[in-house]
């Protein structure tokens, strides 16, 4: 036999799929979910954990699962065994399964039957299956024999957009077909006079003005619900559809979705709808919206299911997420908004301010200087005191804590501050702090040990008052501890404050958007053991001029650290310290994560809130350790969970330009505000939590544009990763080592996600998401991979620097550190620090004469990135970017990525550059040379010698004086016409002979492979190594014109003898190299549509290679050499 026949071909097997969830069905206490051709089985038993118990791979071949139909059992018991028909596209398969005692067994599986048309619906009929096909016909199928028993078409052979089969026997079978003419056609297949004889429709139902995507029939009440492209849901009174000639009445026309409605489901008491706007609505049968579930991202919710006994709704989205929600009557309910009826003849004056002391006591002050208390339990108002000094202008703030520590503070326009014990208001303490107006008040609490009140006066002076209580608890003591002085600004007062644990510093935010760090007491910085290395002179008394007109001068402690204008001109709204970090929010629509090192504030990460919520008002840490964001979205107050992307509470309050207060405990949440001269109160039980379950986290809401593997972490036995598979369910050879691959993905949804992919569980865990980009992210590059602690003290984990770029010519650099953490589901935690950013038009925004200049095209996109690591000590790497405006740009990273500057550029290609790739050439007795390859939409390749360019002009490594005029990159060392159209994939690999193997894939489906030689020539006018100039020459060149049927978007040379390519034709193909033209070895069909990128890497000798494919989803393959 020929030696090639004995070669073991690489056979790639799918180990993980993250695709849109297109099918859901509750069977007893189990949930079946369809994801591509795979079936996920979840246990919904309340006695155990809500978890996945099995993934059945490739059940439907190359078809996507769209639905499940369970055969009814005579005894109605589906808790032990079930016969399930799985269908999607043109495929159908029947499976008998057993799932008792938390295990899953597949008892029997039929063959995969391919229908001649699209399957819209399936229904069991006495052991057979009826199928509604795409051109308005019905097929009766025998699942045991695998043959068609009968096929009946309709006289209207139109294309259908949905269908619903009704009935339990062939004689009474009814089909409701949604035609592209926006009509519902009701007809009866059993009335056919002969086989294949068309049947005329019995009824035509009109009403929708768009295509009907889904329908649901409730037999007990004779109702039919339809969902349409016209963004509406209609409810029809149809009676018993199994009886011909019935009357149809439209009893409900429901508008609530802002986009197309994909799915609808009728329950006994509810109607569930879900659509393209990623919202699942719960309606009454009268058309009233009862609940709205928001949390999925992207292009919509594709599948819904309901568990009526447990009152659950399950949704599956385009983001690959699966969520479980509680219907009305289960879990926590909002108590709604109620007016507290303040207006009364016994309570004169107009309300000026309101605050909350805990979740059940409310304080309000009027323009007469009267302070009132409202007890939510007693539901009555009580006047605590009245002080004429606090007429007209009055600030009111309650002390933090579960019930406000029983204290509140008032301030007026004459510099007076009053601290009031709520239970004994006669023991209030007055102090005059300033000769002018008090601009703001805030409390700072350190556990139960220390309570401070900060008051801002004229000239940026902040008085710090120490509050303590007498042993009897009936009196309080107010003592001024020190004074701080804010940096100069137009509106010079603080807005919020918090203790930085362990309590040596105070973190404050001011009206100009700055975050400041102050010592919590005078003389603190004299102690060398506190605060680390503070700046010289920081915290020392400084002098500021007052604004009272008397020429008085105030002295105060200056900040030891300042982050000026961090949140823009609208100011900082809150400061929270948790887990060693400082979190700040502002009215710029962002929240920052900061930390203090050596007495200095340092930004870690900037995150955006949900779209449209530009006024962030606060941040809370909930009992499970996650955070929720408070803010205003137009005229609504919103409590938003950034992890689940869900709006937990929405209150239509009229906006944030009013007095309002928020308080939350584990038992309840309260939001009070002034509107129409009265106090309005919204309360919800359960605090800032929502009793819903995320069965599986979503990944990205839009297409994945780039996949990049960072490295591998080995977890010891103490960090064992839990597996949802039983040991006897694992596939042979899948028992790999306890390795976890860290992969970075970026997407058109403007986020960069860090994933953990264990080799043993076939699962994916999203560790964190970075949301700094303002447009789609197209490319990611990684450099500086290491371990925590560095080479001297290596620790378990992984560190790396990441550069991401995309639309609006925007680039960001950040570092990640992945460390073991047994408290998380993935047993890993990821810490992200944002280092720097760059936009091409930043310099233009700072130009005073910009009206005379031509602005850089704001639509420029970065298409690809490549990191070029220099061999010169002390210099950071270069980042090469392929740009849509025809340029190849080089950026210089300095100070470990904290400085990112444009260095050089070239417009050689004169058209959109799609790919850049860097590689090095190393030869004996010669210095290492850095080369760059770029590819454009005309199919040309250009090779640049970066080492020669840097040697000839040493000033190139210094950033240009004018950021708008970078250096020129020069002319390429070699140009090559490799393809007839755009090049979407590019890779190189050094050979043993000292050459380079270069491969490229094009939009025309072709591959181009050639061997590149780098020869060093001596210049006549130069001597030594500096006079050596590389000459690039092609030694061998081969092409495969029809390697794929569509764009080749992924390419990797695994070794000098094997190459793998991926294309939009959904084929992963292996090629043999080294024997002339690349020859076909093997091909595997993958399930990710519109694949945009691919990355392959070796894992271990036991596990072989892994390959990640990203597009409209993510799929991971592995194969053995």
From Swiss-Prot:
SMART domains reported for this sequence: WD40 (SM00320)
Record keywords: Acetylation, Cell cycle, Cytoplasm, Repeat, tRNA processing, WD repeat
Residues where N-acetylmethionine is found: 1
Alphabetical list of Pfam families matching this protein: WD40
Keyword ATP-binding: no
Disulfide bridges in this chain: none
GO MF term set: enzyme regulator activity; RNA binding; tRNA binding
Major location category of this protein: cytoplasm
Residue stretches of each WD repeat: 53-97, 105-143, 147-189, 200-238, 247-285, 289-327, 335-376, 381-422, 425-470, 476-520, 559-598, 604-642, 645-684, 739-785, 848-893, 901-946, 970-1012, 1036-1073, 1079-1121
Function: Together with methyltransferase FTSJ1, methylates the 2'-O-ribose of nucleotides at position 34 of the tRNA anticodon loop of substrate tRNAs. Required for the correct positioning of the substrate tRNA for methylation. Required to suppress amino acid starvation-induced autophagy. Enhances the STK11/LKB1-induced cell growth suppression activity.
Quaternary assembly: Interacts with FTSJ1; the interaction is direct, and required for 2'-O-methylation of position 34 in substrate tRNAs. Interacts with IRS4. Interacts with STK11/LKB1.
PANTHER family for the chain: WD REPEAT PROTEIN (PTHR14344), WD REPEAT-CONTAINING PROTEIN 6 (PTHR14344:SF3)
Name listed for the protein in its UniProt record: tRNA (34-2'-O)-methyltransferase regulator WDR6
